[in-house]
Structures are given as C-alpha cells and as structure tokens.
C-alpha cells in the first residue's frame, strides 16, 4: 500500500477502477457497463460465458458515469446519455460494436432514456424540453419525436410493455404533493389510467412488466413500510408480497413465476426473491452489504438463468456477481480492482442507533427549536485507527437517501488519512418507511440537523479516542446544505466545515434549479416561495452567514444544474459582506470546480477533489495521520 503521508495514496485511491450501470443484452449473453479501467470512463461489454471484456468506446461517452445506458433491441448497439461537462442537459446517443457513434435525440433540457421498444421501432424517454419532465417517444423510421404526456408534475419511469401496446409510468395529479400514483396508458400516451393502488399521499410506481406483458410489478408505501406487489391487467387486482416487516420495493420479474424485490434493514440492502405461486420470499444468500441490479425495467437475468447483480460491503468494492436462484450459489463475473490495496486496508463500518429529539445539547445559534418527537436514529462510524482521531461528520445527500454498508470511496480516503467518519441517517432518510421519510416535510434545517448533531455528540461522549477539538462537518448536495447549516446553527460543535455543491439560498435554488427539482424537491418539501417566504428565508444558511465561527471550505462545480453554482457564490458574497476574509490563511476558502457539475466519478476530477479536501483538513485541523 502507498504511504499514507503523501499524495501517492490519494492518486492510488482516485485511480481505482469503478464499474457502473451494468445493463443486460436482449439475449442475456452480454452485459454493457461503464468502466474506467483505462483511467477514463468508457463503455465496455462483458461476455457472460467467456468473461471477455471488450471496450467499445474511446472517449465518446461522458467522463462522469452518472447516467445509465440501455441496449438496442438488436443487441448490436447501446444507447447512452451525453451532456456538456457535467451539466446533465443530456442528449441521447448510440454506439455500436465497431465504436461508431451517432446522435439519436437532441433536445433542449434534460433527456432521460427509459425504454427501448422490443421491436426496435422507437425509444421512450423523459425530457424537460417544455419545462416539466414529461414523456416523449422517438420513432426511428420517421425520425420524429412526439410528446406523449403533458402533466404539471414530473413523470417518472415510463416504460413500454413487451408487446409495445401499453406504457407504464408514475406521476401525481392530486393536490397532495407527497402523492405518487402508478399509471397505464396506450403506447401513444392516450387513455391514461390511474391504477389507484395506494391511498392518496402514498407513493406508488411501476417497476417492471412481466415477460408476457399481462402483469406489472409495482411498489407502494401506503402501509408505511414499502411493499412490492404484482398488478394483473386482466383482473384489475394487485397481490402484495411480503409480511410488512421491512421496507421493500419491486425490482424486476425473474420469469413468469418469480420477482425480485429490494429490502432495506438497518444499514444494509438485500435482494429478495418471491415465488408468485406461494407468496414465499427469501433473501439472497450474500454477505451483508448492498446488493442491487441496476436500472429499473432492466431484467437482470442472463442466458443461463442466473441473476446478475452488483454487491459491495464497506471494505469490499463493488463487483459483478451471477447468482443461481436454484442452489443459492454465486460466482463473480467481474472482480473489483484494488490496485496496491487489500480489503483489510479499508475501514469497516459500525452500525449503531441513538435516541434524538432533534435538539442536541449544543447551543442553537440560527433557529431556536423546541424538542421534536424522540426517534431512534441509525448511524455508521468508521474508525480510522488513529489515536486520538479527528472526526468527520458526513451527512448524506438526497435528502431522500440514506447511508449504508457499501464501499464509500470518500469515506475511505478520509479514514486512510487518519480521520474517523460518522454518517447519520437522520429523520427524512429512506429505508425506514413513509412516516420516517415525511418527518422532513416543511422542516429543512430543523430536527434532521439536530439528529446529525446529536449523533456527533453521542460518539464524542462514548468514544474517548475521538478528539473533540478536531471535529469537522463535510457533505455534498443536501449533505452540503447540512454542512452549511451545521456551521451556522451549531458552530460551537465544529472546528472546520466543508460544504460541497450545497444549497445556501433556498429561494434562489427554487428559481434556478431544473423544473423537476423545483416541483419534486423544493415545492414538495417547502412549498412555493411566494406562499411560504418566511420558511424559505428562515431555513436558508445564507441568512445566518455571520454565525460561521470556524474555517469553511466551499466547493462547487461550475456546470451544476441541480444545485446551481450561484448557491456557492451567494454564500461567498454574504461572508465577504460580513467582513470575512478569503484565502488559505483567511476565514474561508472558495473553489469552483471547472468542467464539472453535480460531482463526478472521473478519476482526475476525483483526485482534484481529494487533494483540495485533504489539503484543507491538514492545514486547518491537522491530519489525523502524518
């Protein structure tokens, strides 16, 4: 392993090859995926029988592997999304086996490919061309693009049935912003029908068509914990699966008699196979971690009948696995690369819970909250092994997400540099059901931030090997919002802060983010600024910029369209107006990341981020490991 005291370890970690978005060919003999084993993200195709990995692209696909790929119906080309240096204003391109690339759909806004007709005649995709994310089709013979839906709220997951006659998707036509319903329409978008599978206010959506197209696998959280079910188009009835003990969602049909579901418990995500004749289900026999099959509506079954999935743990990087449901045996199709490292070199995750009423012992400086309901909050602690160890509090993004027992490269970078890392699944996180997730509605900057601070207080009290004079908050996206908020709400707790692609001015965010983020994020959680101006101002970190009382590093991609770079610039201006000085010896530091949007998987861009983060922490609080 490289020395942990120089730049070699950062470069070695940033250079670890990463696979993304495995997608299965129509005949089940190949898997297309993004892989950066060459040092740059490229499209590769894996032969599942021989294990041969062939590189199709040579710089034509995006550097950042954020967006998924889909096979063409003939199995001789793959569709991918292409943007401009991470701005996510995707067009849809195709690449064939000899590396030839051509544009297929070029439109304003963001395009999101969701379905390829099995006869190869057309594509179905989402686009924000006209404002909101709606569904469109592209006809290969005529070259024409047709708008299929025109909803005020975003439409998600549109997918053609196997016979090409129907379209399944999810949207919301009710006045309840928390609601989502599953719909079926004719393939041209006509005759849309709400299946009305869940109660108003719950979230329901399609996951996969059955091979014969007569049934639809759906997910719904009406009972609180999510559940998977199979809807029969002929009888207009749904059969729900599972006993309701865990938060679950539908993944895909395996065949006509079995489906896969995803199950969240504590900080792990496991796959469950359900027998549709008996209703019995069992978890796949894999080590506890995170197992996933990739994009929805992409059956993960290869030609020999095995299920292909990605599996990872805190110390084992993602690998591609073929799992035999008949005997619960599995083999690795594509092993993870470790470079100069071994799995034992990485820090493992300890899962624990803490009781929180959303109000920590640390003084509240921005908004004074009364105690909320006391809830059990889950968290993960990564021990760097350094004694004493500085602590990095690392709230997740989303906010509709959670931290789990998977390999996290940023966490391992910090741990190898001697910083222990705390991740907190605050109220509002996923994996705990609808009620827990909805705790965050109308309360950004409230109890969820108190949960983060309470968990930090807990580990500092319980682990005497943590150095309470070297505590830093670091987060990206909504985690960046949390980093800003922690620094202005609980400045006494932290010795430095790092806010990456974070929100600072909620009204500016509302005005300048993409349309589907405006409705499905900002309006859903906070309402509209003109209807709720006080809340928008009160919960914006920039309102309290003068509360920053420790060195702050601000990082933001210049091409970010989810959280525009204006968010960082506004906070910088507020600090300067309050008399704060910028620079390595100043009160705050500021970096705009060129040719980058809302984070990046590109190896060079990751290394840039690692160096900025490592240098700031070393200068400002002292590296955990010299």
Per-region residue spans from a language model:
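Conserved alpha/beta-hydrolase
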Residues: 418-433
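Short, Asp-centered acidic motifs that coordinate Mg2+ and/or phosphate
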Residues: 390-391, 420, 472, 496
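Active-site-proximal cap/loop segments of hydrolase catalytic domains
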Residues: 429-626
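Sequence/structural signature of beta-propeller modules
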Residues: 1-11
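Conserved beta-strand scaffold positions in the cores of enzyme catalytic domains, especially
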Residues: 351, 421-423, 590-592
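Structural cue for short, hydrophobic secondary-structure segments
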Residues: 394-397, 423
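Peripheral, non-catalytic segments that deliver or gate enzyme domains
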Residues: 10-20, 26, 30, 34-67, ...
């Amino acid at each position: 392993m490289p020395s942990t005291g120089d730049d070699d370890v950062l470069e070695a970690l940033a250079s670890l090859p990463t696979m993304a978005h495995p997608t299965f060919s129509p005949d089940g003999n190949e898997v297309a995926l993004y892989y950066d084993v060459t040092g740059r993200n490229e499209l590769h195709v894996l032969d599942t029988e021989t294990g041969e990995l062939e590189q199709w692209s040579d710089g034509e696909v995006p550097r950042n592997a954020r967006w998924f790929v889909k096979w063409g119906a003939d199995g001789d080309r793959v569709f991918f999304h292409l943007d401009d240096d991470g701005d996510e204003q995707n067009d849809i391109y195709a690449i064939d086996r000899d590396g030839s690339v051509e544009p297929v759909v070029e439109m304003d806004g963001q395009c999101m490919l969701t379905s390829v007709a099995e006869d190869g005649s057309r594509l179905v995709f989402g686009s924000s061309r006209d404002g909101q994310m709606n569904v469109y089709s592209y006809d290969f013979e005529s070259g024409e693009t047709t708008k299929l839906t025109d909803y005020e709220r975003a439409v998600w997951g549109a997918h053609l049935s196997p016979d090409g006659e129907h379209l399944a998707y999810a949207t919301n036509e009710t006045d309840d912003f928390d609601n989502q319903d599953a719909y079926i329409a004719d393939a041209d978008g006509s005759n849309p029908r709400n299946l009305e599978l869940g109660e108003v206010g719950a979230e329901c959506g399609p996951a996969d068509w059955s091979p014969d197209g007569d049934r639809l696998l759906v997910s719904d959280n009406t009972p609180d914990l999510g559940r998977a079910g199979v809807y029969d188009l002929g009888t207009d009835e749904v059969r729900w699966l599972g006993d309701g003990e865990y938060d679950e969602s539908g993944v895909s049909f395996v065949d006509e008699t079995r489906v896969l579901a995803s199950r969240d418990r504590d900080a792990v995500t496991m796959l469950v196979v359900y027998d549709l004749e008996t209703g019995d289900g069992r978890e796949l026999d894999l080590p506890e971690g995170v197992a996933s099959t990739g994009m929805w509506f992409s059956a993960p079954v290869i030609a020999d009948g095995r299920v292909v999935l990605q599996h990872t743990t805190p110390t084992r990087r993602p690998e591609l696995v073929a799992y035999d449901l008949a005997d619960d045996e599995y083999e690795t199709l594509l092993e993870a690369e470790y470079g100069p490292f071994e799995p034992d070199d990485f820090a493992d995750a300890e899962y624990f819970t803490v009781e929180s009423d959303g109000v920590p012992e640390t003084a509240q400086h921005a908004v004074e909250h009364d105690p909320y309901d006391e809830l059990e909050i889950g968290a993960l602690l990564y021990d760097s092994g350094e004694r004493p160890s500085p602590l990095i509090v690392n709230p997740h993004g989303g906010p509709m997400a959670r931290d789990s027992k998977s390999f996290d490269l940023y966490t391992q970078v910090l741990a190898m540099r001697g910083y222990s890392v705390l991740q907190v699944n605050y109220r509002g996180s996923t994996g705990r059901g609808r009620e827990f997730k909805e705790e965050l509605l109308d309360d950004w900057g409230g109890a969820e931030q108190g949960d983060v601070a309470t968990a930090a207080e807990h580990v500092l009290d319980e682990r005497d090997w943590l150095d309470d004079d070297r505590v830093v908050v670091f987060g990206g996206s909504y985690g960046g919002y949390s980093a800003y908020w922690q620094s202005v709400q609980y400045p006494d707790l932290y010795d430095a802060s790092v806010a990456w692609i974070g929100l600072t001015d909620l009204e500016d965010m509302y005005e300048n983010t993409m349309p589907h983020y405006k409705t499905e994020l900002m309006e859903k959680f906070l309402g509209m600024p003109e209807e709720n101006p006080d809340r928008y101002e009160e919960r914006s970190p920039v309102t309290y910029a003068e509360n920053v009382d420790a060195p702050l590093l601000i990082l933001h991609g210049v091409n970010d369209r989810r959280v525009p770079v204006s968010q960082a610039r506004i906070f910088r201006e507020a600090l300067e107006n309050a008399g704060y000085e910028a620079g390595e010896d100043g009160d705050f530091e500021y970096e705009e990341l060129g040719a980058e949007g809302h984070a990046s998987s590109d190896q060079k861009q990751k290394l840039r981020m690692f160096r900025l983060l490592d240098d700031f922490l070393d200068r400002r609080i002292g590296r955990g490991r010299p």
